[in-house]
Swiss-Prot record:
It catalyses: Endotype eliminative cleavage of L-alpha-rhamnopyranosyl-(1->4)-alpha-D-galactopyranosyluronic acid bonds of rhamnogalacturonan I domains in ramified hairy regions of pectin leaving L-rhamnopyranose at the reducing end and 4-deoxy-4,5-unsaturated D-galactopyranosyluronic acid at the non-reducing end. Transmembrane segments: none annotated. The gene is rglB. Glycans are attached at residues 110, 143, 239, 280, 522, 530, 564, 571, 592, 633. Pfam families: CBM-like, fn3_3. The lineage of its organism: Eukaryota, Fungi, Dikarya, Ascomycota, Pezizomycotina. It is an enzyme of class 4 (lyase). GO terms for cellular component: extracellular region. It comes from Neosartorya fischeri (strain ATCC 1020 / DSM 3700 / CBS 544.65 / FGSC A1164 / JCM 1740 / NRRL 181 / WB 181) (Aspergillus fischerianus). This is Probable rhamnogalacturonate lyase B. The keyword Signal applies.
Length: 658
């Protein structure tokens, strides 16, 4: 790759004016600014170190790793975390005019981690008339001596302010709250990894309005539902002017979820907090991720509300936004695929009766869509399907894809491999989705929607705080199994209420919690589902099928996908007993299917499902009982402050007769 040579580089200070857009460079910094927005990069840090909107400091003073950003870091070197630019940062700028006639300037960081030879590039671009930074992030590894390095566990950019300007954080309408005060943070009590209790400061605005507990996972969100997230300053510390700092997500998941904002505005590009797979870094690995856009809005004299500034940012969450600009800067960005090498998919799928909220996903051919990372060079696209079954996905990099369609209310997915996309062409797809069936449905429990949120302490709103966040987002230890379900789960089809009588998580062991030191083993591991059958239902039936769909499951591997033979529950067996049968219906949740789901405030993670057939004569006229069994007191070794128990989270269950 060739870079534009900085003009006047031999001088102590160089300045280049592009109409209102200006570039300045000295021995230690590069500065880009236009009429309203200014960003300063430190050549020695490889990061933005100062940022201003209408003269207002958005970052605050530098202190260690705070007061800087956006910057790039990862969990990807043999020792773990690494911040791009920490070894030998080489900073250069580029400039130009895009195809729309708009001037732009960019700053490019190059850094090589010497022990492994991993190459990092971070790109930041500012356009004239915009108040934000367009960003791309690249990691490359070429090493024949060590062809397998490790997994790319985390790859992210962070806007990490150190200022009282910001007063609120938000990742959705339901996940909006005041930031905890410095006083609350100074007196917080650790209850779990990255989770604190503010019981020592009950008058703090976060405590009174949102929750007694704070965890970065409370504001995590699924990418399908996440257009924009960030920070808001209500003017309290900025002379009445309001400000917003947003990560605009014009590329998404859809089931992937992770951290969004907790005082830091994150762009989690690759991660596995909720059990998604991560790509391996092997010889030849070379990926450029982006674009993403950090927008800073409001400004001097602004009285715009959080909702107004958020809505302004959300309008930019469109993959086609600024496409001409991205094509113009593709010559600067290694690995970015321009529009000339992209095509479209125009499809129509006849949906099964009862399908709602359908979605179409393009992922790597031949693989389950949540395993897209097994091919590190793969891409992923998705779009909602309208009520007539139509969808269109534009700007798809040419190649061969798997099409997956799923919908709320329908068990299973529709899958078609071999969807070929050619540059400049539109691929047409017409399909009919016949919902899977193993006979006549006798009953179902839960809604097949890839979430356990409909059950107790799931999406139900917290009644004790005026902002009423969904209960699952708070912290699992805020609730007490022994108080909620002292006799365990004894559910009756047709009369029990799934929102109160079926828990969002099936623990092997529960506790302790901050308010209850007891550990409960006896009522947690076996759950009973009772149901009645008539003679008519059983007549002529030879085969029964039990379908269990899990929205998430935790084995002893947690969210690492690492096999450890010393852990007895590294692969977790889930067993279902029909009436008094001694032999269970079993399926194994593999170590590479495990998620750290509910303990990190999620009800939808890596999906696992099984359809198990058994003789219909195991059932009887009248009362029947299905027992869902996890191993008794099944735990693992945790290196972080997290519950050691294994658990599963049910999406939905169904019994069919044939």
């Amino acid at each position: 790759m060739r870079f534009a040579i900085p003009l006047g580089a031999a001088c102590a200070w160089a300045g280049v004016a592009l109409a209102a857009l200006q570039i300045a460079e000295d021995d230690s910094t590069i500065t880009l600014n236009n009429d309203r927005f200014k960003a300063v990069w430190s050549k020695s840090k490889g990061s933005v170190v100062d940022m201003f909107l209408d003269g207002q400091d958005l970052l605050g003073p530098q202190s260690g790793s705070t007061g800087i950003g956006p910057y790039l870091d990862c969990y990807c070197v043999p020792s773990g975390f690494y911040t791009a630019g920490a070894t030998n940062p080489r900073m250069q700028y580029v400039e130009g005019t895009d195809s729309t006639g708009t001037n732009y300037a960019g700053v490019i960081l190059n850094d090589t981690y010497t022990p492994t030879g991993q190459q990092f590039q971070q790109y930041w671009f500012l356009r004239d008339g915009e108040t934000g930074l367009h960003m791309f992030s690249r990691l490359a590894y070429y090493n024949e001596t060590t062809p397998f390095l490790r997994n790319l566990q985390e790859f992210r950019t962070l806007f990490r302010p150190n200022t009282q300007l910001w007063t609120h954080l938000t990742s959705s309408e339901l996940q909006t709250a005041p930031l905890p005060s410095k006083n609350a943070v100074s007196k917080q009590v650790v209850v779990q990894d990255a989770t604190w209790r503010f019981n020592n400061t009950p008058d703090d605005a976060y405590y009174t309005q949102f929750s007694e507990y704070f965890t970065k996972y409370t504001f995590s969100n699924q990418w399908r539902d996440n257009d924009v997230h960030g920070l808001y300053g209500d003017g309290t510390n900025s002379n009445g002017s309001t400000y917003g700092a947003w990560l605009v997500m014009n590329t998404k998941g859809p089931l992937h979820s992770d951290l969004t904002v907790d005082g830091i505005v994150y762009n989690y590009i690759v991660s596995n907090h909720h059990g998604e797979g991560t790509p391996n870094i092997t010889n030849g690995f070379d990926r450029t991720f982006g674009p993403q856009f950090y927008l800073f809005n409001g400004g001097k004299g602004s009285t715009s509300s959080l909702q107004d500034l958020r809505s302004e940012a959300a309008k930019l969450a469109d993959p086609s936004w600024n496409a001409e600009f991205y094509d113009s800067i593709a010559k600067h960005v290694v690995g970015y695929v321009p529009s000339s090498k992209r095509g479209s998919v125009d499809g129509r799928v006849k949906l099964p009766k009862g399908a709602t909220n359908p979605i179409a996903i393009l992922t790597v051919d031949g693989q389950y869509f949540q395993d897209n990372s097994v091919v590190p060079s793969s891409y992923q696209y998705w779009t909602d399907i309208d009520t007539s079954g139509k969808f269109r996905i534009d700007r798809v990099v040419e190649g061969k894809y798997r099409l997956t369609v799923y919908a709320d209310g329908i068990f299973g997915d529709f899958v078609r491999d071999g969807v070929t996309v050619k540059a400049g062409k539109t691929t047409t797809v017409k399909e009919k989705w016949d919902a899977e069936s193993a006979g006549k449905e006798v009953w179902r429990l839960g809604t097949p929607d890839k979430s356990s949120g409909e059950f107790r302490h799931g999406v139900a709103r917290d009644p004790t705080h005026p902002l009423h966040p969904p209960e699952y987002l708070i912290y699992w230890g805020a609730y007490d199994w022994q108080s909620d379900l002292p006799k365990g789960i004894d559910y009756r089809i047709g009369s029990s209420d799934p929102a109160t009588d079926f828990n969002t998580v099936h623990w092997s062991v529960f506790g302790p919690t901050p308010d209850n030191p007891d550990v409960e083993y006896n009522t947690t591991h076996d759950w009973k589902i009772n149901f009645s059958l008539t003679k008519k239902q059983l007549r002529n039936s030879k085969k029964a099928t039990l379908t269990i769909q899990l929205a998430g499951a935790k084995t002893a591997s947690g969210n690492t996908d690492v096999y450890n033979a010393s852990e007895p529950y590294i692969n977790l067996s889930h067993e279902s007993y029909i009436n008094d049968q001694k032999e269970p219906l079993s399926f194994v949740i593999g170590f590479n299917q495990s998620s750290s789901c509910i303990v990190r405030s999620a009800v939808s993670c890596y999906q696992v499902r099984s359809r198990m057939e058994f003789p219909a004569d195991w059932l009887k006229v009248g009362e029947n009982t299905l027992t869902l069994h996890l191993p008794y007191n099944a735990t693992d070794t945790e290196t972080a402050i997290l519950p050691a128990t294994v658990y599963v989270q049910y999406d939905a269950l169904r019994l069919e007769l044939d």
